[in-house]
Amino acid sequence: MYLDRENLFLILFDDINIAYVNGELFQDNVMRDGGALFLGHLLPDDSLKKISSEKGRFRAKQTKFAAGSVFGQVQSTIAAEDDILICDDLGDEWADFIGMNTKGAPPTITFYHAKHGKLTLGAGAFHISVSQAEKNLGRLALPKAAIDTKFYSWEKEPYSNSNKVTAIARVMRGGPRSDIEKHLARLRNSPEVFKRVSIVTSSLSKKA
């Protein structure tokens, strides 16, 4: 049998310390404590308690995302410390938002992935978000040639969705472009910069 011959079976047991992987049975007593370590990376935020959608509805003249949406809370609250904030949603999307705190100690570059869904303790929807974030980790380096191309789309027109062209500027804070490029030139290869990914979701709870 092919699966057996190639040791492709992965078997998990009721005891989370035991797993059968790659044709071998493992016992790792550290696994149970690892859950607490993982939960330490989940940071509750009160601004997400009353969220009703991911992006909200759109009007022709609106200048920011709806307050009741995850996008709206990233723009107004979650990424409030970023003096540069760019909406990169849709198209050649690296993240829903790219934020930079150029004055922090250390300065930070953050990719925000914003998601909404039914409140749950399950990790299914969260896993999808993690997978989407993983594929763009290399782009946290913000390579100059790629950023030059992206600026064209960021500056070309405001954000549009659901057949509505809004007045939401994609470069939300930190412009003009020349100022952002100066910060990028300093931060791009600086050893002190903290590069991170933030999955902002209203669907995951520690105590649902």
What are these regions (language model features)?
Residues L37-L39, A95-I98, V197-I199:
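Generic low-polarity alpha-helical segments
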Residues M1-R57:
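Long, charge-dense tracts
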Residues M1-R5, L10-L12, Q73-D88, R188, ...:
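Core nucleotidyl-transferase/polymerase catalytic module
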Residues S47-D92:
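Catalytic-core elements of nucleic-acid end-processing and repair enzymes
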Residues P143-K207:
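Metal-dependent nuclease catalytic core centered on acidic motifs
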Residues G117-L121, S203-A208:
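Short acidic, S/G/P-rich loop/turn micro-motifs used as interaction or catalytic elements
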Residues D28-D46, K50-I51, G72-A79, L119-A133, ...:
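Extended, non-catalytic scaffold segments that flank or surround catalytic motifs
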